[in-house]
Amino acid sequence: MNLMFMMLIIMLINLGISFYNARSAGQVWAESKAIGGWLRLLVWCGAIQAAIGFTMVYLIIVSYIAVSVGYISPQLMGVLFNLVYLMIIVPVIGTGIIITIQSWIAVARERSLMNIGTAGWNTFATAYNTYNAIQSFGPALSSVQEGLSGLFDEDSDSDNSTYRVILLAAIVLLAGVVTTSVIIRRYAASLPVSEEVRNAGLRDLSTR
């Protein structure tokens, strides 16, 4: 019960951060497209971070439903998590580094408590994600290679299970992208770009 409660809290926090990033990106999406440059890059980073966050929430929900109804085995749920992890970890680290650089630029321009806190969190999150990737990428890749070996076997049951894992991974990734796109379109051009935004970019994006 406690584990489920903690997982629910984490999912809600992830949803909140993802929605915030998607909305922030949407508010200046059209303007950043016109301005281009560093601001446009930051907006894309925010959108990618949002899509990844939504994807992870959908992954948890879909994987547990899939196991509960017998669509995939509990063992393949781990393979599914590792497959999605391999797909998102490079974008997570890449966008996190860019957002972290911007957050420290914001601190250099204005030493406020909020800017320092945001920069500190982004630095910690990016460092943790990078360290975790170094430790986890190899085992995750091995798990996926072993779990998806059914693609090359003559066992039809194994082959079907493999395709199911790939299908679920594609579904949750697509759902994360679509959710982000809908939010961006909903809030597009709802916030004028001030001179401060042109100079500083999206200083309040949060990485994960």
Describe the function of each predicted region.
Residues M1-L3, T207-R208:
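Short, Lys/Arg-enriched, disordered terminal segments
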Residues N2-Q27, R40-G70, Q75-G150, D159-A189:
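Alpha-helical transmembrane segments and immediately adjacent membrane-interfacial amphipathic helices
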Residues G120, F124, L191-R208:
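Short, highly charged, low-complexity non-transmembrane loops/tails of multi-pass membrane proteins
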